[in-house]
Structure formats: structure tokens, C-alpha cells
Amino acid sequence: MADSKPLRTLDGDPVAVEALLQDVFGIVVDEAILKGTSASEKVCEWKEPEELKQLLDLELQSQGESREQILERCRTVIHYSVKTGHPRFFNQLFSGLDPHALAGRIITESLNTSQYTYEIAPVFVLMEEEVLKKLRALVGWNSGDGVFCPGGSISNMYAMNLARFQRYPDCKQRGLRALPPLALFTSKECHYSITKGAAFLGLGTDSVRVVKADERGRMIPEDLERQIILAEAEGSVPFLVSATSGTTVLGAFDPLDAIADVCQRHGLWFHVDAAWGGSVLLSRTHRHLLDGIQRADSVAWNPHKLLAAGLQCSALLLRDTSNLLKRCHGSQASYLFQQDKFYDVALDTGDKVVQCGRRVDCLKLWLMWKAQGGQGLERRIDQAFALTRYLVEEIKKREGFELVMEPEFVNVCFWFVPPSLRGKKESPDYSQRLSQVAPVLKERMVKKGTMMIGYQPHGTRANFFRMVVANPILAQADIDFLLGELELLGQDL
């Protein structure tokens, strides 16, 4: 039988290759896309690790398998994977499945090129610059630079490295020997990549000075200034402030204008981690949350989050026009960046980054933007805010639900208080018992497969749920289901 042939025999057989891929695409459309985004299907099919290993048959063998076996493996992989495009996947800051962005991702994978030179990626070199130009314009810059990075964490680390290089350019050659003790400043609500970046870049986690935040999670500029003065008095050299627009848990937006004033007074690089909240710049109604972002030196922005461009799509944007990226990271590899090419070598952007090979991440965003237009993407943002308001009002109406605080963004943080704890807030063990509720409900919902929502403690607060309203296909019915399902799962607690 033809189907029993090992797939290695398809090399050089275009008819067989086409037949295989048609079948695979059919499985992807049916199982991952149509079922994976249907509210009538499960979000996940939970299995314990050992059982899942057996079901997947993960061991790699010396002999190839038949086409039918491979197709069945594709079905199995999809079946047991979490469907992040599902309207009831609320677990992360990314969700949803934009079909135009997905088309861009499929084309990207099919062409399998690297973003480093114009000669092998002419379309994408030009496209990346146009997309970055548009993002910079939304920030408020008429000129500048930028690059797509493998995730927002790396974007933040790039900003830290650029700030250090601008202050001490000798460190590129001499390393840490060229540096005095440095200090950088960020809110206690910042993303953990700032601390990781300090360790990765050799600055050490002690170089990160944590600035106080207010009750809503926003950096307090007065404490920032106090921390800067204190660091100088202790013999450190301040060089960077990292503010956050859209914190991971509370969804807070730091007061950028006031922070920019502090940075200007002290001559510090001003970075804004807008990985989560940057897409709000598309909304004329809500972009005021990022007032002052145009004063930043660098901005991290992840369209794969609120815009649903698909993982990963992470831009680092710079106000700099002095070719700082290339001066900081360039190594002039002669086999790749020859200076006597037959075209303008300024188009070879690969020496701007620390990577060599670099994935094409601009096509999915460009194609989605072409299809939706800026107005369509703006409606997507505004709809997320409107659904957030709906959820907040529903929480206020229902017994057993309590907001942690009024949301500023599309992160809605709340407690589900089960029947046994209602009216007992004054009990000495109330917080401890309440903290046990979210983990139990999370286990129940995941094993049932009905939805996924994250939880966490925060400071002295007991574990609470963080609902992320981001999926473009999310509707009021999904909000109602979320609340009803929590009531159902927790009725015996």
C-alpha cells in the first residue's frame, strides 16, 4: 500500500508532498482552527504527564513511519494541546486566532528565510522597516530605529544593553571592566525580565533598584527620584529607568510624563515596557493611558498579545537615529555582510541584533493590518475595553464575587468567595482559606476542559483570579459562562 511507505520517500515527489500537506492542512483547519475556536469544544484535554507520554509515543526511532501514521500523529498533537484561540482561554496575555495573521505565519514558515540580509529576504527587510515605522508613528516619533525580537523579555534586555552601551561604549570591547557599579530602576510591578536581564547582562540583580508602586500598581515618581539620589549616594551610577504600560497582573499604566521628567533631570535612559499595553495606542478613546510615551528612548511592544498577531511578534522601538543598534551589536561578519555587494548594504539589517539567523515576524502583523486596517484594529481594542466593563458590572451583581480593584485595563482581578466563606471576612483564617480556593477551581476547570484562567497571590492579598479580556471573538456569553462555571465548580467549597 502506498500509505505504508516511510515519508522519506516523498523527497523529490511533488505530487506526494502536495497530497500530504493538503491532508495536514485539512486536519489543522478542522481540529486546530474550527474546533479549537468553538465554544462548544473543550479548551484542553488534560492528561497526567506519564499518560500523555504514552499517548504521544514520543520516542524517536531509526525507521520512518507511514503517511497515515504521521497524519494520526498530527491529530493527536492537536487533540492534546491547549487551544489558545478558544474563546474561553483566559489564561495568558495572548489569546485568539486572527486568520490573516495565521496566513502570514503559514507563508513565513513555508518560505523559511532569515531576516538578516536583503539578498535572501528582500520582501521582509522592506516590510519590517515599514511596520516598525508605523509602530514608531503611533508612539509619536517621526524617525528612529527598531527591530523585531524573539519576545518582549528580549526587547527589554536589548533596551538595557543599548542604554549601557550609550553611557559606556567601551563596555562592548572591555566588558564589565569598563563599568562602574551601575543602577537601574523599575517598579515592583515590573515584568520579571528586567531582573533576569540584569543577571544576563552581567549587571547583577543587586543593580535593580525597586521603586514603590501605589495601590493600583503604578510607579510612584517621587520614590523613583528618592531611589536615584540614594543610589548615587551609595556609589552607584544610575543609567536606566524602565516604566511599564500594562503590568502583567493588575494591568497598571505607570505615569510616563512624570517619570520622563525624572529621567530628564538625571540624564537617564527612559525605557517603556509596553509589551502588554502598547496596542492601546491604536485606540483614540484609550491611548491617553500611555500619555508621555513619546518621551521614551525605547519602547517594547508585543502585537502578539492584545492584537492577536500570533506568537511571536515583539517589537523594540527606538527614538535613536544614530545607528545605535548596529554600533552596539555589530560585528561585521565578512561572510554575510560584505561591503561590496551589488545593492545598498544599508538594507542588510542583521548586524543590528545579537542573533545571526532571525525569524521573520513582520508578515503576520502586516497582513493582518492590511486586512483589518487601523480602524479595524482600533475596534478590536475598544471592544476589549467594553467587554471588560461588562465583566466588572456582572461581578458586582453576583453574590460570591469580589473585585480586587477597579481595572484600568483589560485585566480583571477578582476573588470567587465560595459559600462556606461568605460573611466570614473577619475570621482569622479567612485569607488563608480563601487562598486555597483558586488553585482548587483551576484544577477542576482544567481537568473538565471547560476554560482556563490564571490566578496568583499579590503582596498580602490571597490568591485571586486574573481574567484577561483579549480574544477578538470573545462575547458577553463567554463572560456569563466564566462566572457561571466558577459558581458551578465552587458550589461545594
Swiss-Prot record:
Offer one Pfam family short name for this entry: Pyridoxal_deC
Gene Ontology MF terms: aspartate 1-decarboxylase activity; carboxy-lyase activity; pyridoxal phosphate binding; sulfinoalanine decarboxylase activity
Which reaction(s) does the protein catalyse, per the Swiss-Prot or TrEMBL entry? L-aspartate + H(+) = beta-alanine + CO2; 3-sulfino-L-alanine + H(+) = hypotaurine + CO2; L-cysteate + H(+) = taurine + CO2
Which EC class is the enzyme in? lyase
Gene3D superfamilies on file: 3.90.1150.170, Type I PLP-dependent aspartate aminotransferase-like (Major domain) (3.40.640.10)
GO-annotated biological processes:
L-cysteine catabolic process to hypotaurine; L-cysteine catabolic process to taurine; taurine biosynthetic process; taurine metabolic process
Q: What is its EC number?
A: 4.1.1.29, 4.1.1.11
Q: State which pathway it belongs to.
A: Organosulfur biosynthesis; taurine biosynthesis; hypotaurine from L-cysteine: step 2/2
Superkingdom of the source? Answer: Eukaryota
Q: Which tissues is this chain's protein expressed in? A: Expressed in kidney and liver not detected in lymphoid tissues and lung. Expressed in kidney, liver and brain. 7 and 4 times higher expression in kidney and liver than in brain, respectively. Low level of detection in skeletal muscle. Expressed in brain, olfactory bulb, liver, skeletal muscle and kidney with the highest expression in liver and lowest in skeletal muscle (at protein level).
Which keywords does the record carry? Decarboxylase, Lyase, Pyridoxal phosphate
Co-factor(s): pyridoxal 5'-phosphate
Query: GO CC: one term?
Result: cytoplasm
Q: What activates or inhibits this protein?
A: Activated by Mn(2+). Inhibited by bis-carboxymethyl-trithiocarbonate, ethylxanthogenacetic acid and 2,5-disulfoaniline. Not affected by Li(+) within 0.05-40 mM concentration range.
Cross-referenced InterPro entries, in alphabetical order? PyrdxlP-dep_de-COase, PyrdxlP-dep_Trfase, PyrdxlP-dep_Trfase_major, Pyridoxal-P_BS
On this chain, the residues bearing N6-(pyridoxal phosphate)lysine are: 305
Assembly, per entry? Homodimer.
Per its database record, what is this protein's job?
A: Catalyzes the decarboxylation of L-aspartate, 3-sulfino-L-alanine (cysteine sulfinic acid), and L-cysteate to beta-alanine, hypotaurine and taurine, respectively. The preferred substrate is 3-sulfino-L-alanine. Does not exhibit any decarboxylation activity toward glutamate.
Family, according to the entry, reads as follows: Belongs to the group II decarboxylase family.
- What PANTHER family does UniProt report for this protein, alphabetically? CYSTEINE SULFINIC ACID DECARBOXYLASE, GLUTAMATE DECARBOXYLASE-RELATED
- Record's protein name: Cysteine sulfinic acid decarboxylase
